[in-house]
UniProtKB/Swiss-Prot annotation:
Reactions the enzyme catalyzes: NAD(+) + (deoxyribonucleotide)n-3'-hydroxyl + 5'-phospho-(deoxyribonucleotide)m = (deoxyribonucleotide)n+m + AMP + beta-nicotinamide D-nucleotide
Binding site for NAD(+): D30, E31, E32, Y33, D34, S79, M80, E105, R128, E162, K301
Keywords: DNA damage, DNA repair, DNA replication, Ligase, Magnesium, Manganese, Metal-binding, NAD, Zinc
GO-annotated biological processes: DNA repair; DNA replication
Protein name in the entry: DNA ligase
Length: 651
């Protein structure tokens, strides 16, 4: 890198930094920013006499300019040095002259906050800002329910931590913003930062923010270890994460890092790494600071879940209901060990809202099994060669005219090949009839070869139908035919779900099966609309579907061996007609407990309210458990749940 190139990169890094800190509108992904900073550090390590005073490596953050008043921190809020692999971790430990007694905890991906208490009262809350001066957001901080307003400690103390939005709350916030025509938050961190900097405190309150402490600023505590400090802070009424450890060696640090990385998707909030610090406070004081970082701590970063790539084009997919879904075709990029080549664009309203064009640089996020999606478009990088994404008027599969319903486009041709194939794929999927070995590619092959023409034809497949198909040998054919035969025996509710009736999901299907049994498709509009949880839209959809498919359902009854769940309903006076919410990690799948609860005449809801009777919780329960406790809802673990089923009224 030449000196001129270095100065250009400094200028770019400053621009990205200002957009991130001042505008809450990032111009680059975290990975791109980290890469740029590392390039600057490499140059500066070689040419110490040429380091620019404007380099972000020499500063924590830009000077604050906002509508909020400024607060000077009593003690500086430092950033952390990032390490990205084992070699860098060991190099950091060597510089810190420490290879034992480390304190480790998750590095939550949120907004840093400094709380000041005097005489046991919260007197101010401020953002990190440039490390010395932050924004006064005290009124908003007081709307965060898990931040104590009064603590049992009289001396002045600055308590620092991270404000986060839980994943489930983040999705709800973005759904609401989309409905209101507002731009979406790119990630929970931006959501947390934006929520703290609201002029209307009621908005902050409704965002359900959480605060997790990670350290202290000014204080008069007499502890000798950071772990003791944090134990004391949490005893004052602050949240503690369940992944906090003191370990002896770097090998143990690495072991815990990989353990936490495996739990990444299970955590209710986003994490971007693990904090590693020297536990001995005297040793920390001796090590001191660089111009930007404490020498005694580092952020051991996780692989990025969000990266920047290029939108190459858009494919149009036809779903089983005829809805056209635009899918972004991307320049391949690796995210969390998976090569991502496409991302959902949901619908054409979303394309308009994003303002995305073919050729744009876009930010793509992937978490766990969630379908990758585009969260941001970097319009500043356009070069004029981009092209608009046009809304089609004809079905891409059958070329019939599309029905334009605003956000959604629909193919109304019932014989459209794509609709038929996707209906079959859905029918045999895991949550429906769960026919092992009959995946998407095989369904498409069988349809293409004329071996199946509709859902029913699956159950009439014979050995000879597979003989000339590529990849099929005797064992594979027999396994698939056995799986099809075994799938004929299933619950009535799974069958109803598998039919793919618009607005009728698993919960509604279970309700229909339990309420009406095999006669579920013979009911009136009034009978449907009067079911608990059913509305006019669901009742209308059911009535239209059953009217058209009356004889077809009877034909399925002749083919399949369905279990009548109406007869299986065994009422339990402890839980019958009660409402449950399930949260956290339990000994078996959530679906197992859901089916068990419903089999005893109770129902399972996805959200906690005053009408909730029980919250069944496991390890790492999130905001649902906290909300239930605040509302006085009875919260039970698995042992207590089993006691309920056994008729124990003492629970």
């Amino acid at each position: 890198m030449t000196y001129q190139e270095y100065l250009e990169k400094v200028k770019l890094a400053k621009e990205w930094m200002r957009a991130y800190y001042e505008d809450d509108e990032p111009l680059a992904s975290d990975e791109e920013y980290d890469k740029l900073i590392r390039e600057l550090k490499e140059f500066e390590a070689l040419y110490k006499d040429k380091i620019s005073k404007d380099s972000p490596t020499q500063n924590i953050a830009p000077t604050i300019q906002s509508e909020f008043h400024k607060i000077t921190h009593s003690a500086k809020m430092w950033s952390m040095e990032d390490v990205f692999d084992e070699a860098e971790l060991r190099a950091w430990a060597k510089r810190a002259k420490c290879e034992f007694d480390f304190f480790i905890e998750p590095k939550f991906d949120g907004a840093s906050l400094n709380l000041t208490y005097e005489n046991g009262k919260l007197i101010s809350g401020a953002t990190r800002g440039d490390g010395e001066i932050g924004e006064d957001i005290t009124l908003n901080v007081k709307e965060i329910s898990n931040i104590p307003k009064i603590i049992p400690y009289k001396d002045k103390i600055e308590i620092r931590g991270e404000v986060v939005i839980l994943k489930e709350d983040f999705e709800k916030i973005n759904e609401k913003r989309a409905k209101d025509g507002l731009s979406l938050f790119a990630n929970p961190r931006n959501g947390a930062s934006g929520s703290l900097r609201q002029l209307d405190t009621s908005i902050t309150k409704e965002r359900n923010l959480k605060f997790y402490p990670w350290g202290v600023g000014e204080n008069s505590l007499k502890f000798s270890k950071h772990s003791e400090v944090m134990e004391f802070i949490r005893s004052l009424g602050f949240l503690k994460d369940d992944f906090v450890y003191c370990v002896k060696t770097l090998d143990e640090v690495l072991e815990k890092y990989h353990e936490l990385l495996e739990k990444r998707d299970q955590k209710p909030m986003m994490m971007d790494g693990m904090v590693v610090r020297v536990d001995d406070l005297k040793k920390c004081q001796e090590l001191g600071y660089t111009v930007k970082f404490p020498k005694f701590m580092a952020a051991f970063k996780f692989p990025a879940l969000e990266k920047t790539t290029t939108l190459l084009g858009v494919n149009l997919q036809v779903g089983r209901s005829g809805v056209i879904t635009p899918v972004a075709i991307l320049e391949p990029v690796e995210l969390d060990g998976v090569v991502v080549k496409s991302a959902t664009l949901h619908n054409f309203d979303e394309i308009t809202r994003l303002g995305v064009m073919i050729g744009d640089s876009v930010s793509v996020i992937r978490s766990g099994d969630v379908i990758p999606k585009i969260t941001k478009v970097f319009t500043q990088r356009r070069d004029g060669l981009e092209s608009k994404i046009t809304k089609p008027s004809l079905c891409p599969e059958c070329l019939s005219e599309l029905l334009d319903e605003g956000a959604f486009l629909k193919c109304q041709n019932l014989d459209c090949k794509a609709r038929l194939v996707n209906s079959i794929i859905y029918f045999v999927s895991k949550k429906c009839l769960n026919i092992d070995g009959l995946g998407e590619n095989i369904v498409e092959l069988l349809f293409k070869e004329g071996k199946i023409t509709n859902i029913e034809s699956i159950f009439f497949l014979k050995y000879d139908d597979f003989l000339n198909l590529e990849g099929f040998k005797e064992k594979k054919i027999n396994n698939l035919l056995n799986a099809i035969e075994n799938a004929k025996k299933c619950s009535l509710s799974r069958f109803i779900t598998a039919l793919g009736i618009e607005h009728i999901g698993e919960v509604a299907a279970k309700k229909l099966a339990q309420s009406f049994g095999f006669d579920w498709f013979l009911q009136s509009y009034e009978a449907y609309v009067n079911l608990e949880g059913f509305g006019e839209q669901m009742a209308k959809s059911l009535q239209e579907f059953t009217k058209i498919n009356h004889q077809r359902i009877k034909h399925f009854y002749e083919i399949l061996h369905l279990e009548d769940e109406k007869k299986e309903l065994a009422l339990n006076e402890n839980i019958s007609n009660k409402t449950f919410v399930i949260t956290g990690t339990l000994s078996k799948s959530r679906d197992h407990f859901k089916e068990l609860i419903e089999s005893f005449g109770a129902k399972v809801s996805s959200s906690v309210s005053k009408k909730t009777d029980f919250v069944l919780y496991g390890s790492e329960a999130g905001s649902k458990l906290e909300k239930a406790q605040s509302l006085g809802v009875k919260c039970i673990n698995e042992d207590e749940f089993n006691a309920l089923l056994g008729g124990d009224d003492e629970v």
